């Protein structure tokens, strides 16, 4: 089935990126223009107060803009009738606060998010904030939450005492752990253990245990399916296999474009993740 094609613009998406991340942004924009109707703009930061504009396919590109002029540039480029979304793929945070005051939603996407996550409380007073890692965790979070649709699991929700996560990306593991700790009753008493994995997958597995109860999620070797396992003790474990869904960068950004409200679950998860090492 072909993806829907948009002939009109639905939002302005401003990506701040550089280096290898820049090509990934352009590749994602080629898809998003067709599937989400975005008005794409790419800005790289540098030393020019008024960089010239070039066009790559349907994307407006501004190379080497001085960070302190970023807010002026975005204000002049955005269309007032369209929501504006910022996509931050820079390690530097210079200009980030100013951008947050001009966009309706800010999507963080730094290789090392430590610094930008520390800014989330400040950013969230200006705009709705999310993160590409958070979007990538959506299927994991949904499946984990479904464990608690079982009355037997809900009855034991206060008994869990250990969370173990194996991950190729430690920051994703911290964010997922932060979400679980912030959402579970007495979550702060969980002993959190993280194990590094050398696979390219951001997450490989998680297990929440307490007494005889074990809740597990693991990525299967195919990399496109997750297995959920519920072991309540005294009975054979129950399992099922579910697709991970489209995990491409364009799909993750597309999902974020459909969200408009403030995401307090993300903010709470980031706050807890800061204390997990």
Language model feature labels by segment:
Residues 125-214:
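A contiguous, surface-oriented mixed alpha/beta subdomain in the mid-to-C-terminal portion of proteins
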Residues 25-26, 96-97, 173-178:
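A short acidic (Asp/Glu
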Residues 63-151, 161-166:
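Internal, hydrophobic cores of structured domains that mediate oligomerization or house catalytic pockets
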Residues 171, 184-188, 198-277:
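Long, compositionally biased intrinsically disordered terminal regions
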Residues 1-89:
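An N-terminal, globular interaction/scaffold subdomain
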Residues 1-8, 23, 134-153, 238-240, ...:
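Short N-terminal or domain-adjacent regulatory/targeting segments
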Residues 55, 101, 158:
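Structured loop/turn residues at beta-strand edges in well-structured enzyme cores
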Residues 31-43, 79-84, 101-107, 126-127, ...:
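Structural alpha-beta junctions
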